[in-house]
C-alpha cells in the first residue's frame, strides 16, 4: 500500500485539461507529473463532448497518482437539458426553464453511479429538487 500524499478534487472540461491553472498549481504542490495527468485525463474524457467532469486525483508519496472521473454535475446536466445558460438568481419568483419528467429520469439515470439514492425514482426526486432550486419548472412526475 502506497502512502497517500494528498487528494485533489477538480472540475475540468472533458478532453481539454491543460497544465495551466487550476490543474498545474493543484498537482504541482504535491510534485505530481502534470503533463502525464493532463494527457491521461484528456484521453479518458475525449468522448464526453464539452461536459464538465469532476475528477478526484489521489497523489502518492512517490509522486505517482491515480484518478477517478465522475459524472458531470447535476446542475450542468439540468442546464443542458433545459437549454439555459444559468439558473435563476431568484428561483422562487423567476422561472428560467422547463423540464419534463422523462428528462428528469434521464438525468437521474446518468447520475445514478454518483448518487447515494436507492432507486432511480429517488434519484429523480433529487434531480427535480435541484432543478426547482435553480428556477427550472418540472412538469409531470409522481408528485406533480
Swiss-Prot record:
InterPro entries: Ribosomal_uL11 (IPR000911), Ribosomal_uL11_bac-typ (IPR006519), Ribosomal_uL11_C (IPR020783), Ribosomal_uL11_C_sf (IPR036769), Ribosomal_uL11_CS (IPR020785), Ribosomal_uL11_N (IPR020784), Ribosomal_uL11_N_sf (IPR036796). Coiled coil: none annotated. This is Large ribosomal subunit protein uL11. Part of the ribosomal stalk of the 50S ribosomal subunit. Interacts with L10 and the large rRNA to form the base of the stalk. L10 forms an elongated spine to which L12 dimers bind in a sequential fashion forming a multimeric L10(L12)X complex. Contacts the CTC protein (RL25). Keywords: Methylation, Ribonucleoprotein, Ribosomal protein, RNA-binding, rRNA-binding. One or more lysine residues are methylated. GO terms for cellular component: cytosolic large ribosomal subunit. Forms part of the ribosomal stalk which helps the ribosome interact with GTP-bound translation factors. Disulfide bonds: none annotated. One of its GO terms (biological process) is translation. Belongs to the universal ribosomal protein uL11 family. It holds the Pfam family Ribosomal_L11_N. PANTHER family: 60S RIBOSOMAL PROTEIN L12, LARGE RIBOSOMAL SUBUNIT PROTEIN UL11M. GO terms for molecular function: large ribosomal subunit rRNA binding; structural constituent of ribosome.
Amino acid at each position: 500500500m502506497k502512502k497517500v500524499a494528498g487528494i485533489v478534487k477538480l472540475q475540468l472540461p472533458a478532453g481539454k485539461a491543460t497544465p495551466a491553472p487550476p490543474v498545474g498549481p493543484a498537482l504541482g504542490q504535491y510534485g505530481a507529473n502534470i503533463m502525464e495527468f493532463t494527457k491521461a485525463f484528456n484521453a479518458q474524457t475525449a468522448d464526453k463532448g464539452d461536459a464538465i467532469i469532476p475528477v478526484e486525483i489521489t497523489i502518492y508519496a512517490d509522486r505517482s497518482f491515480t484518478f477517478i472521473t465522475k459524472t458531470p454535475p447535476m446542475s450542468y446536466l439540468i442546464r443542458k437539458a433545459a437549454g439555459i445558460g444559468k439558473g435563476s438568481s431568484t428561483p422562487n419568483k423567476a422561472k428560467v426553464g422547463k423540464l419534463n419528467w422523462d428528462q428528469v429520469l434521464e438525468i437521474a439515470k446518468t447520475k445514478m453511479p454518483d448518487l447515494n439514492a436507492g432507486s432511480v425514482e429517488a434519484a429523480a426526486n433529487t434531480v427535480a429538487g435541484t432543478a426547482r432550486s435553480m428556477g427550472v419548472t418540472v412538469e409531470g412526475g409522481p408528485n406533480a
